[in-house]
Amino acid sequence: MKPRPPRLTMAGLLLAAIAGGTPALAQKPGGVLRVHAIDSPPSLSMLEEVDANPARAAMGIFNNLVMFNQHVKQNSMASIVPDLATGWSWSEDGRQLTLPLRHGVKWHDGKPFTAADVKCTWDLLTGKASEKLRLDPRKSWYGNLADVTTNGDDEVTFHLNRPQPAFVSLLASGFSVVYPCHVSPAEMRRHPIGTGPFEFVEFKPNERVTLTRNPNYWKQGRPYLNSVEFEIIRDPATANLAFIAGKVDWTATTLPLMKAVKSEAPDTICEVTPGGISRNLIINRDAPPFDNADMRLAMAMSLDRKTFIDIISDGQGDIGGVMQPLPEGVWGMPLDVIKMLPGYDPDLQKNRSEARGMMQKLGYGPDKRLALKVITRNIPPYRDPAVILIDQLKEVFIDGELEIVETASWFPKVMRKDYKIGLNLTGGGVDDPDQQFYENYACGSPRNYTGYCNPELEQLFDRQSAEADEGKRKNLVWEIERKLAEDGARPIIFYNRGAYCWQPQVKNWTMMANSIINNFRMEDVWLDK
């Protein structure tokens, strides 16, 4: 019998103790935390949205069954702690995950939280509920979930078709919040109700999202803040000025602009961290001429990743594959292994020469170039690398014209594959292969924007997912990485490192190294003023 995950390791118990009761260090209650948001979310429906902006703004409204410790920088199985669940245990065969639940927790409208709410949530996510989600971007996470059953009001069991040791990590994602049975998905888009530390007040599109303290929160003494306001400022330079003027307390900025912040406000605390977001080339494999494998590979081999990093990340980005690069990423490949992948050879001219040869065999050349639209989302983290991509594709006889898509239309457009090629950002709700592979590369997944489908490789997805030995699993993951690169499934360009700054009075908020959303519960954050 393969080893099964323990109910809760000693490390998990220690982390749980930390999360449940951070030692008092003269935390001051009260105050309004003003957080910069880079875009206006389509809604605050956590189960339906895919972007970081709604996730960041809404995570504090909800609770998970389990979550990643808010004060451990790297998300991993070892940093998962209880939340609405008080613990978890696996059956001997590794197919049943049972979680006892906290008693006495209330929804923001005063109704009791029970195991029925957990079942309702995952029935929604798997399409079994009578009501349906408008979008279900994470349905692919739960392809191995057969059923969810309840044992009274205070216990729930997830029944799996096969062992999946990392299933708990999917439940810990900031996206894996629990919804109330008694509130419809449509109402959750307009006025989300949770059990979390903050209650929803209002959402003014393109202006702000406002949350207020939940006075009946089940974690005694939390949250410290009276309210949180997410100020929507799309232009990074404008956001910088607002931060320097003290109008916002926390901002996501660029590395060059961070230097201006430190110069103008030297007491500011700034941190550069990766966060696990890749810039990648999406190619509609069903749209000629991109249904040709050599065409897709030629485009992948044209990429000068170092130039992207130098321009966009001030030289501080990372080169990697599907999984976030080491050391911040848990499952990334060593650099010497990455260099062996197609298009990753450090000899750029060799790569491009081979790519031009492929294109010429397809009938393209200096006198017969391919003209097309390159789509991307209308915010700087997408637009800026898209301009560089268009310039680099010229090296392989492709002339691109930038087509800008507003945020509200971006995800629906790429989900229905209404494009030829595009510049995309992909972030994982979890730094785990089960999330990345099934969500972005499995046949029929809503977020498989390129239409990639390889049933034989999916069998390998299942093998790595069921493997309990971490070393053996990594070897399978890297084998999958090689095949995805060879197939040009979704060429990864580079991983950015983001710059985050906060005012010195903001205390007890940890930026995570392999997630940009999982640290936004904010129940432990306080203001020293």
Can you describe what each PLM-predicted range is?
Residues 36-92, 123, 191-195:
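N-terminal lobe/hinge region of extracytoplasmic solute-binding protein
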Residues 67-75, 164-223, 227, 234-237, ...:
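Gly/Pro-rich hinge or "lid" segments in bacterial periplasmic/extracellular proteins
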Residues 95, 342, 346-349, 399-410, ...:
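Extracytoplasmic/peripheral linker and loop segments enriched in polar/acidic and small residues
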Residues 100, 119, 135-181:
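Surface-exposed binding/hinge segments that line
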Residues 102, 186, 215-261, 297, ...:
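Ligand-site clamp/hinge motif
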Residues 132-135, 148, 201-212, 229-287, ...:
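Extracellular/periplasmic solute-recognition and catalytic clefts
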Residues 260-263, 286, 290-333, 352, ...:
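Periplasmic-binding protein-like
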Residues 319-361, 379-384:
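Structural transition elements
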